[in-house]
Structure formats: structure tokens, C-alpha cells
């Protein structure tokens, strides 16, 4: 199945964090782009630029194949802490719990705000 994720096109979305620290309206912009352009969404990348207080989200996609609607969701994991020791089990558990209510996950990306909140972005089939 990994071959179905192959892509060579990218679209960049940028904006401020929403008040709740999620990607806010950028989620709908991504879904709308996929629907309007009739592309197959394959991957997302998320980077939070603390100094600029801006998000940069990259959408990897392909053209000319099967298309499908997508939904982009952000789930707050809160402050995880304790990662200095290298034990990431709490983060893994939080991410696993966060995806329990989301069906058809295509990919995910984790970001951390400047005040230490962990959030995960899921792209799933709508």
C-alpha cells in the first residue's frame, strides 16, 4: 500500500494558530483545495514557527488518479512533559487515544506550541 502514497506535488498553507491552538481555518482550506482541484491527498507536514507564531502546512498530493474528499482534524494532547529521559510512551499513548474516534486516517503530523502543548493533525478520508 505504500506505493499508493507516492506523490510529487505540494501545496503550502500558512496562517496563525487558532485561539484553541489548532490549525483552525487552515483545515477547511486544505479540504477545499483537495475537493476543488480533484487531487488525491497523500501526506501532510506541519511546522509551527515559534518566532513568527505561524503555521506552515504542506499537503503532498498526486493528480490524475483516484480522488477522494479529506477531512483535517486537530486534536490537543495537552502538555506531555517528561520526554527528557527519552521515554516517549506517554506521547505514543496520547496519540493512539487521539485517533480512536477518527476513521480512515491517511496520515498524521505532530506539532508543539511555544508553551509546550502537543497537538496532532490527522488527515482522513471524509
Predicted regions and their residues:
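Terminus-proximal functional modules
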Residues: 1-126
Amino acid at each position: 500500500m505504500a506505493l499508493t502514497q507516492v506523490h510529487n506535488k505540494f501545496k503550502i498553507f500558512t496562517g496563525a494558530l487558532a485561539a484553541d491552538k489548532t490549525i483552525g481555518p487552515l483545515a477547511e482550506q486544505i479540504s477545499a483545495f483537495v475537493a476543488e482541484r480533484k487531487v488525491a491527498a497523500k501526506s501532510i507536514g506541519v511546522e509551527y514557527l515559534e518566532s513568527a507564531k505561524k503555521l506552515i502546512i504542506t499537503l503532498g498530493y498526486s493528480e490524475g488518479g483516484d480522488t477522494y474528499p479529506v477531512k483535517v482534524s486537530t486534536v490537543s494532547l495537552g502538555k506531555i512533559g517528561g520526554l527528557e529521559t527519552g521515554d516517549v510512551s506517554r506521547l505514543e499513548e496520547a496519540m493512539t487515544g487521539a485517533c480512536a474516534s477518527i476513521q480512515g486516517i491517511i496520515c498524521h503530523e505532530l506539532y508543539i506550541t511555544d508553551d509546550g502543548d502537543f497537538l496532532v493533525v490527522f488527515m482522513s478520508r471524509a
